[in-house]
Structures are given as C-alpha cells and as structure tokens.
Amino acid sequence: YKDAVTRMLANVASAGFDASQPLLAKHGAEKNVLFVLVASDRGLAGGFNIGPQRYVEHEMERLAEQGINSSVITCGRKPTEYFTFRKVKPAMSFVGISSEPNMDEADRIASFVMEGYAQGAYDRVVLCYWHAKNRVEQTQVTEQLLPITKEQLTMPNKPRTPEALSKIEGHEYTDFAFDPSPEEVLGQLLPAYFRTVIFHALLDSAAAEH
C-alpha cells in the first residue's frame, strides 16, 4: 500500500511539484528537530531497543552542542522509560502498541507532527525504527520525515520523466488530466502519504520485533 501511494504521488509530483506545500517547505535555519523513535514494549535481547535509543540520544546531544533544540516521540515502553529516566520528557509517548500497532496511533502521531511542522514548531523531523529485512535479519532505519523532499516522491534512484517511469517494473505511467490542478491534488495526497509512512514504520518494527 505504501508503495502504491508513493507511485501515485510520483505521477502527481511529475505534473506539479509545489515546494510551498506545508509538508514540503523548508524552514531556513534549523532551530528545532523532532525525532520519532519506534522500538518495543518488551526488553528484547541485543540492540533492538538500545541501538535506536542511543542513536537518538547521541543526535540530541550533538544538536544541543550546536545550539539546536530537539525533542522525541517515543513508541514503545522501553524507549519511553529510557528517556524519562534521563529526564527527557517525550513530546508524545505510546505504550502497549508495539506488538499490534493500529492506524489510530499512526494518525495521532502523524497529526501531531504535521501540525507542529506546519506551525513552525519543528524545522526537521526524523524517523528511527527497525526494518524487518527477513525472518532472521533486521536493519535499523533512519530517515527524514519532514520536510518531504522531491526525491522521496519519486521511485528510488530513478529519474521521474514519463519515459523513465514507464520502464520501472510494476509502474505504469499515465498522462493524467488533473482537475483540480496537480498542485492541489498533491496537497490533498501528502497527508495521506505521511500517515501511511508512519503506520508502515510501526508495522515494520512490529514485524522485526517478532
């Protein structure tokens, strides 16, 4: 589903990429960074919780040295306890959902983040979670959530021309006629795309946990 939404956005963005959209707009000088950390409710072996927790903690310390404020949303009992113990109060925290995430939590996170970014409370938003590569291997993923870049709305490492898109396996390019304009359609699709990215991270982390 996430891939399908991304392909749809690739078609729309190819017709009209409007950098003034709230989720695409850059804020200039970076003053506030928000991390969305997805880990586990359980104390799992290895670095499942420790790896992303320490990464976010070190990044927050590095930003503080540069005079940049930072905060974190914690998804999972362990990261919530980790930062609370270190006197860092999460901007939001979710406990008891790591094994069975649902769209309600994803919507709450996405709405909070999108509203905060649009109002200028955050200048950059970073997502950190585990990707279930296969049954025995997981990969820690760190990616920028906001601002959404032009590259994120295209197929990975591929140009976005109609000719190039038509050659990508599983991607069919159609020369759409937009009503309303592609810029307006893009503005309507971006929030749905953003919610999908959040929910995908919660599901991916749950799969990696198991």
List PLM regions with ranges.
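C-terminal beta-strand-loop-alpha-helix "lid" module of Rossmann-like NAD(P)-dependent dehydrogenases
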Residues: 1-210
